Amino acid sequence: MELPNQHKQTAAEGFVSFLNWLCNPWRRQRTVNAAVAFQKDLLAIEDSEHLDDINECFEESAGAQSQRTKVVADGAYAPAKSNRTRRVRKQKKHKFVKYLVNEARAEFGLPKPTEANRLMVQHFLLRVCKDWGVVTAHVHGNVALALPLVFIPTEDDLLSRALMNTHATRAAVRGMDNVQGEGWWNNRLGIGGQVGLAFRSKXGCLERRPGFSTSVSRGEHPDLVVIPSGRPEKQRQLLRYSGIGGHLLIGIHNNSLSNLRRGLMERVFYVEGPNGLQDAPKPVKGAFRTLDKFRDLYTKNSWRHTPVTSEQFLMNYTGRKLTIYREAVDSLSHQPLSSRDAKLKTFVKAEKLNLSKKPDPAPRVIQPRSPRYNVCLGRYLRHYEHHAFKTIAKCFGEITVFKGFTLEQQGEIMRSKWNKYVNPVAVGLDASRFDQHVSVEALEYEHEFYLRDYPNDKQLKWLLKQQLCNVGTAFASDGIIKYKKKGCRMSGDMNTSLGNCILMCAMVYGLKEHLNINLSLANNGDDCVIVCEKADLKKLTSSIEPYFKQFGFKMEVEKPVDIFERIEFCQTQPVFDGSQYIMVRKPSVVTSKDVTSLIPCQTKAQYAEWLQAVGECGMSINGGIPVMQNFYQKLQTGIRRTKFTKTGEFQTNGLGYHSRYMHRVARVPSPETRLSFYLAFGITPDLQEALEIFYDTHKLELDDVIPTDTYQVSGEHLINGLPN
């Protein structure tokens, strides 16, 4: 009886499956034998240190590589130019694989065989192949062979482990018990048992650190007069928990006469030159007229505005600021604004200083005008700011100013800029003391944007004119300083942030037009990152310094990065959380600053409440981020929050501001997140887990306040030395 065709096909497939089953053990054994032979050949190869020896592994590709493409718009593709022209010679494959393994082991040692570590090592090996220009067709095969070998212990690894388990090692470790603590002293006296008592260090404690005044006094200026009062200077204080934070030394400037003088001299009147202090550079005559195209485009995308009422302006504030501005509004109702209200009342900014980076930095000064002046100008520009940022976005064709966005939104915006380019690279612009370089010409150019949107408004014109020539008094507990300064951005003005954004965006737009290249700008005032094609990088970086110099600004180019996570913007870097990118603050900095309080905590209970607030805010922006979520979990003391941390200064500082619209919660970081965190901050997945264990097992002790000159060694050395 003949079988139907369907049954014949089923029988044939079954027979093939049976043959495959019979052959599988043979195939597996053949693969194992090949792996053993490959590993044996690899061990027989001598390690190479000379690049020439590695170069002999390659040959230049005779033909063109397959064309790679990348989506640059909906339905549009662009060719991706590649410099990968080297093929790995077949007879030298073992040597190149061993080179890859040695490079990875030199970078990571013997990592644990986890998925996060596998992704990290794989990324590193792919980067090495890219740096050597290996053609894409040869990358996968070599990386696939090198990757597992990185996790296999060598004879030296086994010997190292064995050394820790010898009789001599154990005897030496036991001997340490008798040279510590009371046991050592008893043994020296010949009394008591021959057993040492190890010292137990405290897990951490509270530390009060007083503010300081600079010992530097440089320069003279005829428009600056110092008038000492003879009274002693008042001390500012920081309260810090030592034992869980980072290794950085954090300090604060006192509002003293010496600090005021140095701050005004070095941050208002003069800039650093090759031979010491000198006047800030002046813009080339007519330079800002070259930026008229951006101003006209801005005006075209904007519209006429009218000032808001005083009550509408007050709705932007709460707490102490609301009280101050309400009193100013009341006084304006029976006493009109005058030129006296435009005078500056200057003081030293109270901020956390990284003294590990700069032991004695020039103090920063805040130069506000009277609240009455701020109310009048704020009625024009406080609500106008958000409109201005949207208009700038229209000019660039994308979101450009990051102010007002959450850290999650900023991460996604930055990623969208990165994805626009086939071979992207990011360049940070370091504006050296931007406010100080804002000339009269720069201010007048900025003011044109406002005056065009408030046409024929005489009061706004008068208010802005007061910023061109500044008269002020700096107040300290031990004296005052009277001074005059033409031009320069006054840091307390209502339009400081908005004005800096407009100026920087205008200049970068002009640079883009001047070079005729495509670029994307991420801006937050004087903090900027430019993303462009790698092919345009040299043209861009060589033009930045001379281009900005013609406008009177000193601009330095930071090291370009071609790894997305390495972008540094406003002291944050992007990290992938498993579903999206989020901007994350630097662990090496925030673990020191976020356990240091500027708010005067009078009792340990208040400081414990402050730590609880920091922990809650930190968790809301770092949930799911390795290391950081464990750090902020530990800061949560369980103390119920009161008005002390729910209102006032805490809600307006950086951490409180960033956490307002974010509600992240703790979750286990994915391997992809650990890889991204490593790429951003250089902390390997193994070290991430070690830090997390340290934070999870640490006990907060808020019992004592120790002298400020006491340095307590703790687990903070785990973070010391990590890349910034």
Curated annotation (Swiss-Prot):
It catalyses: RNA(n) + a ribonucleoside 5'-triphosphate = RNA(n+1) + diphosphate. Pfam families: RdRP_3, Tombus_P33. Transmembrane segments: none annotated. GO terms for molecular function: nucleotide binding; RNA binding; RNA-directed RNA polymerase activity. Its EC number is 2.7.7.48. PROSITE patterns: RDRP_SSRNA_POS. The keyword Nucleotide-binding applies. Keywords: Nucleotide-binding, Nucleotidyltransferase, RNA suppression of termination, RNA-directed RNA polymerase, Transferase, Viral RNA replication. It is an enzyme of class 2 (transferase). It comes from the Viruses. GO terms for biological process: viral RNA genome replication. Residues 424-540 form the RdRp catalytic domain. RNA-dependent RNA polymerase that plays an essential role in the virus replication. Belongs to the tombusviridae RNA polymerase family. Readthrough of the terminator UAG occurs at position 203. This is RNA-directed RNA polymerase. It comes from Tobacco necrosis virus (strain A).
